[in-house]
């Protein structure tokens, strides 16, 4: 029996430093990559207002376009659904005989609720997740998460001697999409939003900013800029 994975993108719109995606790439025969944007009124009561600013919409859209472009270099497209994640995932599970579901660990209450609902509604599917948003994994810490120090200084003193692991490299290849995935919709155009001249979304843009930040030695001014509320050269 073929193993078909469904990867749920959320706040990890990148291929680099994505352990869950690497896991899916190594284990699956086929792979579906999904981003579901839930703008329904019922979602607003759980997540706050679904009315995003034009700039936020533009940034998200640019990030999705960048991810879709990166996936195309692997022979993939990002499946985009404008509906609740649980509904979008369920449709793909049945239409593509999904056997495994992957995601990055999330601290979001709504995202975790959706994950739990999917696990409950699809008990025969294998669910796997990996940490990708933090410098340390819980098992790296010299204390349990429940015993987290109350102040940053105390936390820093306990963890500054821990070696930070290297970011997970992007997969060398991805399993092919299922044969009938071509009919699925990808990222739509967003022509009604005025582009921001200040911030641009996308993994490649993010890497460019990180490289520029450290190449300019800006980390050495951290103590004088860490409280800045905006600006490309502030904080880390």
Language-model-detected regions and their locations in the chain:
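Trp/Phe/Arg-rich N-terminal binding region typifying the photolyase-homology
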Residues: 1-167
